Structures are given as C-alpha cells and as structure tokens.
Amino acid sequence: GEAVAIMSRTRYEWTGADFALWSAGAVPVPIYETSSPDQVEWILADSGAVGVIVEDAGHLAAVEASRPRLPGLREVWVIDQGDIDSLSQDGNDVDDADLDARRTALDRDSLATIIYTSGTTGRPKGVELTHGNFLTLAENAAEEISEVVKAAGASTLLFLPLAHVFARFIEVLAVTAGVRMGHSSDLKGLLDDFASFQPTFVLAVP
C-alpha cells in the first residue's frame, strides 16, 4: 500500500511501471512531466511517496531540489539511466509467493492510485481511485464498444499524458480487452507514429 510516484512522458516504461506497482500492492501516484519543482515537492509530500520513478536528468533535478524536505522518500529511479532495467533484474530475486500474496490481498475496494488535480484553485488535491473504479469503467467500455476493442487485431496508440486519468483508463481497457497498445510522447511526430503503428482505433479528448 505504499505510494510510488511516476513522473515521465507517455512511454512503454510508464505503463510497465504502473502495472508492476499494482502487482506489488503499491499505489502509483502520477506527476505531470511539466510540473514545477514546487508541485513535485507538494505531491510527493502529500502522498507520502516512498519512491519516485522519473524519466530523465531534468526530472531528477526537480526531485533532488526538494529531497531534503522529503524524509520519507527513500528511492529515486531514472528511466533514461537504465534504472527500470535494473529493477527488472532485481525482481528476479523476489519470491514469487510474496508477490502472489500481495496480489491476492488486493480487491476492487483496494486503493489503486492517487491522482492530483491541476491546483488552479490552490494546492493540488489528491483524488483516490480504487481498482474497482478502473475495472468497472474498463469492463463497461469493453462491452459498450466491443465491436471496436474486441475486433480481431484491435490496436490503439496512446499519446495522452499518463498523469491524466483518461490515459490510465485506456491502458486498463487495453489490458482488459486484449488490445495491442503502442505509446507516443512526441506530438510533433504523432502523424508519423500513426502511420507506423497503424492503430485500428484511438481514444482521445475532444
């Protein structure tokens, strides 16, 4: 049930970390990659995060600037420095029975994530969502648009920021419905990514 923050653009490692943390019984806390150091510090402190996964050296600097005021923050991992690969290797030493126990201890009422508001009216506020929140929404969507998500060879390209709840819904829907999912973080190159990946459908905000 410990909180671990993720601060990165939309990429495969974001989704991989999200599901890995869920499997370990942890609570992912997304942080927009554009967040200011003050916002980063507030979210890490308010959520009680014990660790944070960042994408690059710039994000690392934002975390390190406030680390002296975050006594509960024990670990910082940097995706671009290969830390996710190292974590995956370290995972080989974790007892499977321990992971199974963590997974089976979760149910639909268990806390899945804390998503922070934009903070336009003051400090960002943490919104707690359960695994049931995500699963019920994904299951209902899979039935309502089954002709799209359950079609043979269904695939989608995720380009929305994963710090936003709608993007998290899309990744859960993809896993629930067995949809192949790609990631794109470069809006300028998005059309090229569409041409390369050739998704059969896209979910996006207006």
Task: Show the residue positions of the predicted features.
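Adenylate-forming
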Residues: R9, V54-V63, P199-P206
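Conserved AMP-binding A3 loop
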Residues: A112-A138
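Structural core segment of the AMP-binding/adenylate-forming
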Residues: S23-S88
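Short hydrophobic alpha-helices that are characteristic scaffold elements of the AMP-binding
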Residues: D18-A24, D46, H164, V172-T176
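Conserved AMP-binding/adenylation subdomain of ANL enzymes
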Residues: L135-L158, L162-P206
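Conserved pre-ATP/AMP-binding loop-to-beta segment of ANL
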Residues: V78, V94-Y116, R123, V149-S155
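Conserved S/T- and glycine-rich ATP-binding loop of Class I adenylate-forming
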Residues: V4, L21, V52, L111, ...
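Conserved AMP-binding/adenylate-forming
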Residues: G1-P37, F159
